[in-house]
Structures are given as C-alpha cells and as structure tokens.
C-alpha cells in the first residue's frame, strides 16, 4: 500500500511538472546557449523585443556554430503567421489548430560558405510539418534585402543539423 502511495505521488508530480507553462516568457540570449521562448502571439511587446534584438545583432554575436536561437509561438491563424513572418512571406492556407511555430536563426556547420538562415516551421506533436527558409549567402547580407526564401515540405533529413531544442514537443492553445 505504501509503495502504491509513493508511485501515485511520483506520477502526479511528474504530470504536473511536464504540463507547466512558463509564467513570464522573457528574452535572455546568452552566448553559446540555445534559447527557446514559449509565448502567445498576443504578446506583442515580447515579439518586438525578439525581432529588434535579432535584426540589430550581427549574426556572429547571435549564433554559435551549429547552435540555433529558437522561438516557439502559438499560432492560431494564417493572419498570425503572416504577421510573424519576416519579409511578410505569403503563407498557404493551413489548419493551424494545435500547431506551433518555431523560428530559428542558425549558421550551418556543414557548408564551406557562411550561410545564415532564418528557419520557421510548423510543427504538430513535435514533428516538423512545413518549413520556411530564409537563406543568405554571406554574413554581411544576413539581415539585408538580399535574402531569398522558399516555402516547402520539409523531409526529416533537412532538419538533422538543427539543435534538438528547436523541435521540442509542440505546445498549443489547449494546454
């Protein structure tokens, strides 16, 4: 009976801890550290801070080898995604229910040229479904107008070099 009690308590603590949402989402970029901030698209102030930080920071200061800086958003509509997308990318009509959006900025270690990419992908149940890639062929152009982008289905091989922290289990509005 005692063992049953302890097992039940362990299960309860584990369940509660794994279903917690951060109380105060914040931006805290530390050198060499992968960051993932969970927030709602309604949190415009935090979004502004994130984009201002990224756009005003040199790529070398933001990125560290294969590591990526990732932000996970709760996306409820095409309009939400359209507002979040850099360069105002045209996005397709999708079922956004229970999807989350992950936005990463990273530098690929597998290319000889310095290629900095912004990467956004929809994910459901922790699986990437759709990818928006913004590639720049030089550090100088990383935050300029010379970036091009494409929207495409993403095979698993294409995200193998993204840090695992970028593809954590999706959080949705039902949690």
What positions do the PLM features span?
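Positively charged n-region of N-terminal signal peptides that target proteins for export
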Residues: 1-5
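Exposed, flexible binding/inhibitory loops of compact, secreted disulfide-stabilized domains
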Residues: 21-175
């Amino acid at each position: 009976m005692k063992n049953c009690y302890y097992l039940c308590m362990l299960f309860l603590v584990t369940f509660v801890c794994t279903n917690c949402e951060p109380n105060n989402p914040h931006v805290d970029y530390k050198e060499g550290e992968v960051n993932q901030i969970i927030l709602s698209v309604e949190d415009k102030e935090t979004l502004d801070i994130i984009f201002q930080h990224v756009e005003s920071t040199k790529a070398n200061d933001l990125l560290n080898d294969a590591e990526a800086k990732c932000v996970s958003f709760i996306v409820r509509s095409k309009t939400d995604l359209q507002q979040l997308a850099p360069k105002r990318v045209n996005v397709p009509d999708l079922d956004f229910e229970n999807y989350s959006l992950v936005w990463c900025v990273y530098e690929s270690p597998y290319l000889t040229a310095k290629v900095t990419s912004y990467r956004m992908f929809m994910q459901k149940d922790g699986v990437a479904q759709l990818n928006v890639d913004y590639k720049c062929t030089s550090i100088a152009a990383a935050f300029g107008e010379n970036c091009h982008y494409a929207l495409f289905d993403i095979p698993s091989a294409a995200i193998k070099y993204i840090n695992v922290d970028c593809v954590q289990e999706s959080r949705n509005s039902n949690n």
